[in-house]
C-alpha cells in the first residue's frame, strides 16, 4: 500500500544542499525513484541498505558492546567520507534506543558542518512490522510504501528522547504529519550557536 505525504523538512534539507557535488547517504534500500531524483542535482548518492543488513533481533536485542564492535562492518565508511544529508527515513523506530544511539553517533561523525540528518519518528500507537519504503515524489512530498500488513507497538519516542539519542545535533525544525509521523531535520548544534544537549 502506498500513500503520499507532505515532507517540508526534506524539502528544506534538499534546498540547502551544496550544488553541485553534494554527498547524500541513504540508509534505506536502493529505489529507482530516489536515484532518479538526485541524479539531475549532481549529487553523489550512496545507498547503505542498512535495514537489510541488520535483522530485527540484532537491531533490538544485540549486546551493546557487541553491537558497537559490529557497527563499523554493518555501516562501513571510507576514510574521510562525509555527507551533507543522511536519510534515515523511519529506521530509528525499529532499533532499540541503545542500538540507535550508537548508529546516530556514527552518522554524526560523518556529517559535514552544515550537514543534516532527516528522520521520521512514529508517534502513533502502532507501526508496520518492518520499515517502509520511501520514495521522493518531489522535494516536499514523500511516497510511503507499507510492506507489511502486520503491525507492532510503536516506540513513540518523545521529543526529549529524540534529543538524547542524537548528541551534538539539534532540530531547528520538525513537522507532525497527519499519518502519525513526526519529521525531524537534525543539524549540528554548533551551526545554530547552541550547546549540545546533555545525553
Residue ranges of each PLM-predicted region?
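A short glycine-rich, Lys/Arg-flanked "PGG" loop and its adjoining helix->strand segment in the class I
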Residues: 101-113
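Residues at alpha-helix caps and immediate loop-helix transition turns in enzyme cores, especially N-
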Residues: 34, 99-100
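Hydrophobic beta-strand segment of the Class I
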Residues: 86-87
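Class I (Rossmann-like) S-adenosyl-L-methionine-dependent methyltransferase catalytic domain
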Residues: 1-17, 24, 31-77, 116-199
Amino acid at each position: 500500500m502506498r500513500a503520499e505525504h507532505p515532507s517540508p523538512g526534506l524539502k528544506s534539507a534538499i534546498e540547502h544542499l551544496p550544488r553541485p557535488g553534494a554527498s547524500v547517504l541513504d540508509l534505506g534500500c536502493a529505489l529507482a525513484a530516489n536515484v532518479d531524483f538526485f541524479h539531475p542535482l549532481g549529487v553523489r548518492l550512496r545507498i547503505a541498505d542498512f535495514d537489510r543488513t541488520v535483522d530485527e533481533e540484532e537491531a533490538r536485542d544485540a549486546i551493546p558492546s557487541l553491537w558497537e564492535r559490529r557497527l563499523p562492518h554493518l555501516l562501513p565508511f571510507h576514510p574521510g567520507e562525509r555527507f551533507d544529508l543522511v536519510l534515515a527515513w523511519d529506521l530509528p523506530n525499529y532499533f532499540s534506543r541503545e542500538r540507535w544511539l550508537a548508529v546516530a553517533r556514527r552518522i554524526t561523525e560523518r556529517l559535514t558542518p552544515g550537514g543534516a540528518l532527516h528522520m521520521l519518528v512514529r508517534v502513533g500507537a502502532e507501526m508496520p512490522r518492518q520499515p517502509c519504503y520511501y520514495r521522493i515524489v518531489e522535494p516536499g512530498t514523500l511516497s510511503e510504501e507499507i510492506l507489511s500488513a502486520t503491525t507492532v507497538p510503536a516506540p513513540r519516542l518523545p521529543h526529549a528522547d529524540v534529543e538524547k539519542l542524537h548528541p551534538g545535533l539539534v532540530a531547528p525544525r520538525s513537522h507532525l504529519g497527519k499519518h502519525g509521523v513526526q519529521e525531524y531535520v537534525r543539524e549540528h548544534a554548533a551551526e545554530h550557536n547552541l550547546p549540545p544537549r546533555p545525553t
